């Protein structure tokens, strides 16, 4: 590990470790900067931008610095600065406890384990790699199978590939309701080894294979409701598996940018990033719980998320913070959509093996992942029928 770190840091030092901060106006006056210098425009906080090389992006992540890569979205002329979030009133209490409890009983740890074993068998799911494309193709087939077996496709449900220029595509499963008001549940499908992304293995069991199979199982459970599968819910529900989160939320930005342009009415977005590791909390003497982000999120939706945990999960929740741009909910927020995020524990007790060859299934708890699946299903069902 130390040798790999030295190699990575030497490469970073050679290219220059620090890039200059650049204003939005400077970019607009110099549209060729990115192409001439092969650098990327990242945002480390709202409106705080910097040009970096790809190696410098990975160095920042190794140092625990979050960012969102806004280069491609900026080049389209639709600069993704923060939009004001639309106000949405969420249900003050659960309305469908009986229905959700019955559906939650059918969620399967065995399904999640089998899916995660296959998903982590790809050498890496790095978004620029061929195996990243193959893993996305495998996942697409699983999502399509779940939708097909439920019968929902006969009532208009679809599964589509959202293409990106880097190769690995994002996946969108859409379960139409009686209106186009939409509830989104997301996870990112890509993985990365920060030392040598194009070469070294990145099983990504927890980050974010766990979230990927969690919402896949929640989708399967949700579609066992005839009302949902037959399109009788008030609202449309979408499940997203984003490409290139590790590169700076690239896939989710492309999707929510598209939604903003097309005036899509997104009423809620929940991101599940890392749902399987509990040993860190237990070692710290902290109770097993779901971590609920309380920074850079919609406060009303976050309160609703807490209420869902209390109503439908066997564990409680703990508030935590991850800073700006820690996962794909950032993209939804940037385009004015209410967003929330759940993770496996308080941030200080989350998995420290991520982004390495050792992010493996053996460290994960499928019992805990089941709680996140219950959370996802309850969130989706309650909001599918919410009177927005």
From Swiss-Prot:
Record protein name field: Leucine aminopeptidase 1
Segment forming the signal sequence: 1-19
Protein localization: Secreted
Chain residues that bind Zn(2+) 1: 188, 207, 273
Assigned GO CC terms: extracellular region
Subunit structure: Monomer.
Annotated Zn(2+) 2 binding sites: 207, 246, 355
Cofactor binding annotation: Binds 2 Zn(2+) ions per subunit.
UniProt cross-references to CDD domains, sorted A to Z: M28_AAP
Membrane-spanning intervals of the chain: none
Family: Belongs to the peptidase M28 family. M28E subfamily.
Disulphide-bonded residues: 322-326
PANTHER family linked: AMINOPEPTIDASE YDR415C-RELATED (PTHR12147:SF56), METALLOPEPTIDASE M28 FAMILY MEMBER (PTHR12147)
Alphabetical list of InterPro entries matching this protein: M28_fam, Peptidase_M28
Cofactor(s) demanded: Zn(2+)
UniProt keyword annotation of Nucleotide-binding present: no
Keyword annotations: Aminopeptidase, Disulfide bond, Glycoprotein, Hydrolase, Metal-binding, Protease, Secreted, Signal, Virulence, Zinc, Zymogen
